[in-house]
Amino acid sequence: MEPAGLCGFCPAGEALPARYTCPRCNAPYCSLRCYRAHGACAEDFYRDQVLRELRGRSASPSRLAGALRRLREQREAEDEPEEAGLGPGARPGGLSGLWERLTPAEKAAFERLLSRGEAGRLLPPWRPWWWGRGTGPRLLEELDHAANRDLAEPEPAPARTALQSGDDAAAAEPFAEDSCAARPLALPARIPALASLSRSPASPLVRFQLPNVLFAYAHTLALYHGGDDDALLSDFCATLLDVSGALGAQQVFGSTEEALQAAAHVLEAGEHPPGPLGTRGAMQEVARILLGEGPVNQKGYTLTALGHLAQTLGRARKQAVIGGERDRLYRARKKCQFLLAWTNENEAALTPLALDCARAHRAHAVTAEEMATLTGELERLWGGPVPPTPRTLIEELPG
């Protein structure tokens, strides 16, 4: 049964009979042109479907697939109403019905989209909160230049200047300028003294846990679009603790490179989707957080990130019902509180850590470029993306 009445979006005096209904507000409309005039409401509907899918509900694949399928069929109906089966008198049979109408290949393609973590691409780009202060996203040009020097050469403390330029800057900007700005976060109201948390002096290896924790923090925030949805809180923290060995497994690292590679290995092994940042982008965001707003308050971003982590882990622990999960969240929260106190009293250690992150970022970029060059050369020799079938050089003739 088609919608009753006239289209609500045609010009006055020219309204045509309504053929479709908005999936969000049930407003009647007659064509693709009028649907586009009502696009904001429909876009909100599809965004809600994506968020429901990311929550992992069992029925959500049908909701999102149905929404996308409906949009496709309505567009086809505008040009080929008879072939698409959406002419007057025919309407989709509901979201669950549309999922059943997908072919096996279409269902498999949609499930691959979800399993690879690419459904988030349907959401508006998200902008990190640490880009919303001062002059915006910034990474020291000196840090990137220092990453190209001999690593055995002593490094002076770099001065804070401008953004990167050229291809590296473009690669370092995974978030669009018109992306959704994250809400600003405040510094923790109270930071305990380090001596009150531990009777013995902190290990010199404590500093290397920061890059590992911040890598997981930046990656998880981008993957979960800011992590503000309470329905995704458990998944958010599970990803965070899996990527950060320092938080999830109380792992100790002997260098910044080791700490970053431990987190990167989780993503490269396919245990979690790479998200909008990927390995290289997450390394770059760690350096940005460690650099802070500038020399006057360099530790501000790191303190804010650790405070945000401690608060988020505390909220997740209140929701957790399994004892083992609650204990794991408790230990991770205590680790964040310890790192918070350590950072507050060791601001001078942040610049060397940021320099190490820039080196790791540059090394990862060089490796990726070399692999791309090698792959291109092999494909040129092979004449395609796969090697040719080996030819038989010596064949034994039948006796």
From Swiss-Prot:
Zn(2+) 1 binds at C7, C10, C30, C34. GO terms for molecular function: zinc ion binding. This is Zinc finger HIT domain-containing protein 2. A zinc finger (HIT-type) spans 7-41. May act as a bridging factor mediating the interaction between the R2TP/Prefoldin-like (R2TP/PFDL) complex and U5 small nuclear ribonucleoprotein (U5 snRNP). Required for the interaction of R2TP complex subunit RPAP3 and prefoldin-like subunit URI1 with U5 snRNP proteins EFTUD2 and PRPF8. May play a role in regulating the composition of the U5 snRNP complex. Zn(2+) 2 binds at C22, C25, H38, C41. It holds the Pfam family zf-HIT. InterPro entries: Znf_HIT, ZNHIT2. Residues 70-97, 152-175 are annotated as: Disordered. Interacts (via HIT-type zinc finger) with RUVBL2 in the presence of ATP or ADP; shows a stronger interaction in the presence of ADP. It comes from Mus musculus (Mouse). Disulfide bonds: none annotated. Gene3D superfamilies: 3.30.60.190. Residues 86-96 have a biased composition (Gly residues). The modification Phosphothreonine is found at T161. Low expression in most tissues; highly expressed in testis; particularly in seminiferous tubules. The modification N-acetylmethionine is found at M1. Keywords: Acetylation, Metal-binding, Phosphoprotein, Zinc, Zinc-finger.
